Amino acid sequence: GPAVMFGLGGIFTEALADTAFRIAPLDRQEAKRMIGEISSRKLLGNFRGEAPVDSERLADVLLGLSRLGLERPDIREVDVNPLIATPKGNIVAVDALVVLDEAPSASGAAAGGKGKQKRQAEIRAALDEMANAKSVAVVGATRPEANGFSGMFGCMRNFGYRGRLYPVNPRLQDIDGIRAYPNLSSLPEIADLVIISVPAPRVADILRECAATGHKNIHIFSSGFKETGEEEGIRLQKEIETVAAEGGLRVIGPNCMGFYVPKNRMLTWENASTKTGPVSLISQSGGNAQDFSNYLTDVYDIGFAKSISYGNALTLDSTDFLDYLARDRETGIITMYLEGVKDGRLLLEQVKKINRLKPVIIYKSGLTESGARAVSSHTGSLAGGEKIWK
């Protein structure tokens, strides 16, 4: 989400690194606190006979930038430098640089109250249907590989999934005696959840088939999208984003492990515990979701209610899962492993509200230089600076 940074130094701002951050929207009190937080704040007062800078007018500038960031989601960056305080008390922006997004996301615009509440209710219902799916179709299901990996279908079956499981692969008649289907339209019912495990270039066509056959709840396990940082991966992600939006699809992923729900024996990796408990996890990283879940169970004997790995966050993001788990009766503690956040202000507001009912524990990656590189290569997220998180 939009953030506002304030600091002194003109062309030396980056070298001095004397800055304060806030997530928009700001109020006047927050803006004035920003001004007072920088180490060189004494320079803004009666320093060596200079007239003090008018803090109210300076706060006006910060408030204006805050509003601009919220009202114009197509703006990626505004750099006002230098901002000069004149002897008469005026604040003058001498130069400014505005960088626009080529394709602004519709999620950046503020939704109306009723529309937002309706969307949240629909997403909660969809996520509950996914977590408690009575039927799952695995597109790209395969027989166990020579190295022993069972694939998405095998992991679900071996874990003892309690619903109806449909392998979809036009090249197979069956998988270990279970009938395989050539496509989604040949299934005997509309599955509550479709797991897509095919090469990235094929995912868009599978999503089109999902939309055409009424399958709305999707988990894309496949990788090879924007997390690669390559032009083709970015293009493929934009394509599936368009297809998902046009089809009204609710997508977890791509590049993720999806749901782990011990109660329902739902699992997309191998060797997990069936022990249930009060902890739920929201994780961008599938590997960390797996390791964290196994660690808590194996070392501390703490069971899980739900674990959700969501990768590149195509249509559903951390705030959607947080809103869902806040109302989930099986979840008593919410843990989050975050690499990037689309709407930081919404996340903060949610956490403050939910903490009154159940604790929310956040593990934030990408705060160091090496961590930021790892995050970028993994999910393609913008990790965000350490000061913003503080």
What are these regions (language model features)?
Residues G1-K390:
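Catalytic-core regions of core metabolic enzymes
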